[in-house]
Each structure stands twice: as C-alpha cells, then as structure tokens.
C-alpha cells in the first residue's frame, strides 16, 4: 500500500495487501484514509482491505470484476488462516463491512475524491485490473499497479497514458522476458510429451489469471486433450464469465469453459486421475 496526499488535503491509499507466506506478512498500519484505490484482486493487493474498512470506514474504489473476485479471495484467506492457525488482523465482521464499502467504476469514467479527479485504465495484468490516473490541481499522475503491455489469452495489454509522474512496479524491471508465444508452445510441447508416455500433466497455477490463461493455451493448441479444471479458479472463471466486458475474447473464454471438465465433487476428482491434464489452484 501507498498513501498519496497533496497540499489540498486530499489523501488516498492505493492497495492494501498481505504477503501469503507461512506465516503471512502484513504491511505497516495504515493511517486513517477515507478512500482507497484497489487496482486488482490478487491477495497481495487486497488482503488487508477488510481491516482498513473495519478500522477506518474507508470507501474502496475498483472495477466491478475486482470487487466481485475480492470477496472470494477474502473468504479463502480467512479459511486458510483458520486451518493453518495463523493470526489474521481482521475477522468476518470486517469482511462483511468491506463488502458494502465498494464503489465500482468503469474504465475511462472520471470520479472525484476531494480536490482530485481520477479514472481507471486497463492494466493488462488480469481481467478487471486497473491503472489509476490522478488529476490534481497541479499535475497528472499515473499509478501503474501490476501492469502488462502484452496481449494475453484473456486480456488486452495496457496502453500508454500521458502523465507528469509515472509510478510503476519494478519486480521484473531488470529481467529479459522470453517471447510469450515461444513459451506457450514450449508448455504445450511438454504437456504432450508427458501425455504421450502415459502420464498425467499436473499444472498448479494461480486461481485468478494464470489458470485461465493456461486453459486457453491448451484449448487452442491441443483441444484433443482431456483437461480437468479444479480449485478456486473455477469460481473465479465464473465471475469472469459474468463480467465479460473485461475479457479480450469472451466467446473464446466461453468455448474453453465448455471444453474443460470442471471438478466439482469427490467423484469428479477420482475421474480426474485418468485425465491427460489437471489444471488446479496452487497448494
């Protein structure tokens, strides 16, 4: 999380997450803020938002899809915390209050916070992820959040926005990325190699973003494979299907969804053992 403030007294917090390690790592305590911008629904960006709302009555601003998926992520975080015995700074009462704290905005739609005008732009990270453009009386700032300018199977890339100040993450800033299409072909080749020798390719992947990308790649390159889809990613995908305005190719996503065999019961899980590929949530 990061607090932005200027001399007009306008103040916002951008994201407030936790690191899902064992035990989890929590951020410094946020000062009181009336408004928080949530760029997307990964737990390292939303994990502490229920605490924020419960303690400060903060309004959460995000896209409709981010708000929908966040509820699922929060409930899963609470469940895992209870099972593993790690303390969580917020409880179910905070979560319930947070669900009513959302104000959702479309891409390109201006809204006001204090003396500032703000609007979201597509970040290209996962569907619903946003960059935030902030127009103050003195300057224009763009907060990139987690962004990607490349086109991926389910979301278009971020576009350049003119600004005076650009705040951008640098996680992969010093790395040379391999060509995405080459990596996709390498994944399909390795999967087919495993299947050809009678094995089952088990692919663990993040529930929001990576699972769906992998399934789209396999569907488009090797539709003859029997692929089973398990874990929380199935529920995330349902939210995507209900918010198709954030999807690059909704028709392609629907076709993949019908093609993949969803694991919804113990008997489905037994059947999956005979599949060619199992794509499931990490852990």
What does each model-identified segment do?
Residues 188-283:
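Hard-cation-handling environments
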Residues 2-37, 42-46, 51-220, 224-226:
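His/Asp/Glu-rich metal-coordinating catalytic cores
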């Amino acid at each position: 999380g990061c607090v932005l403030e200027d001399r007009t007294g306008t103040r916002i917090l951008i994201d407030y997450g936790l690191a899902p390690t064992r035990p989890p790592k929590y951020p410094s305590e946020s000062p009181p803020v009336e408004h928080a911008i949530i760029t997307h629904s990964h737990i390292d960006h939303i994990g502490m938002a229920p605490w924020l709302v419960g303690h400060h009555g903060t309004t959460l601003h995000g896209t409709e899809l981010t708000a929908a998926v966040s509820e699922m992520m929060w409930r899963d975080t609470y469940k895992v915390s209870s099972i593993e015995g790690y303390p969580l700074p917020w409880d179910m009462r905070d979560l319930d209050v947070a669900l009513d704290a959302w104000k959702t905005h479309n891409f390109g739609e201006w809204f006001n916070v204090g003396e500032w005008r703000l609007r979201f732009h597509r970040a290209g990270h996962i569907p619903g992820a946003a960059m935030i453009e902030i127009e103050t009386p003195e300057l224009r700032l763009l907060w990139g959040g987690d962004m990607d300018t490349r086109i991926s199977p389910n979301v278009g890339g971020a576009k350049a926005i003119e600004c005076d100040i650009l705040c951008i993450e640098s996680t992969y800033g010093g790395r040379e990325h391999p060509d995405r299409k080459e990596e996709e072909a390498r994944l399909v080749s390795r999967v087919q190699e495993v299947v050809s020798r009678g094995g089952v390719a088990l692919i663990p992947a993040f529930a929001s973003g990576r699972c769906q990308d992998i399934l789209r790649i396999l569907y488009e390159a090797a539709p003859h494979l029997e692929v089973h889809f398990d874990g929380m990613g199935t529920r995330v995908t349902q939210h995507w299907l209900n918010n198709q305005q954030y999807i690059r190719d909704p028709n392609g996503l629907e076709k993949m969804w019908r093609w993949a065999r969803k694991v919804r019961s113990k008997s489905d899980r037994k059947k999956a053992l005979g599949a060619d590929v199992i794509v499931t949530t990490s852990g």
